[in-house]
Amino acid sequence: MKTNLSSQIKLDRIPKRYYAPDGELELAALTRDEKVYTKIFEGSEEGSVYVAHDVAELIQKCKAEHRHCVLALGSGVGTHAVYAELVRMYQAGEVSFSNVIVFNIGEYYPLAEGAPGTMSLLKELLLVKVNIDPENIHSPGKLVSKEDVYQYCK
């Protein structure tokens, strides 16, 4: 059974109007039966940039409303290009992470001593490269006992 078919989709054989309609009317006709809004991009780079700009827009909206922006971040391969674009935007002065609170949504447990966890990857890809307050970064650590994990995550 093939599980990764996304790389086999040939958008050059499908008219662009079926996945990137020109106007609101075509978009409405194309998506009228969808229950979940979906946007299709020709490549993962374009999709990653779109998602990063969407996240940055949310951060800026929360900042304008004088409130924190709470993000739940994963560390899967699909997120790496999004984080790279967010770092680029931060370095260009397009977004600030000063009002952001981050929760790591998937940490290995128990994490062996010296083993890299998802939090170390999140830090490497994003968190140490932007101006997020370390006190606003939350992840179950190695020191949380099995009995206390639920209470910690609460």
What is the predicted function of each stretch?
Residues 55, 77-79, 84-85, 102, ...:
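A broadly structural signal marking compact, well-ordered functional cores
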Residues 2-70:
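N-terminal glycine-/serine-/threonine-rich phosphate-binding loop
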Residues 21-35, 95-154:
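Ligand-binding beta-strand-loop-alpha-helix segment within the catalytic cores
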Residues 51, 81-86, 113-115:
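Short, glycine/acidic-enriched capping/hinge loops at junctions between secondary-structure elements
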Residues 52-63, 87, 91, 123-127, ...:
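Generic structural signal for well-ordered alpha-helical scaffold segments
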Residues 65-92:
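Glycine-rich N-terminal segment of FAD-binding domains in flavoprotein oxidoreductases
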Residues 41-43, 74-76, 105:
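Acidic/polar N-terminal loop/beta-strand segments that form early-domain functional surfaces
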Residues 48, 75-79, 115, 119:
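Generic structural signal for well-ordered secondary structure
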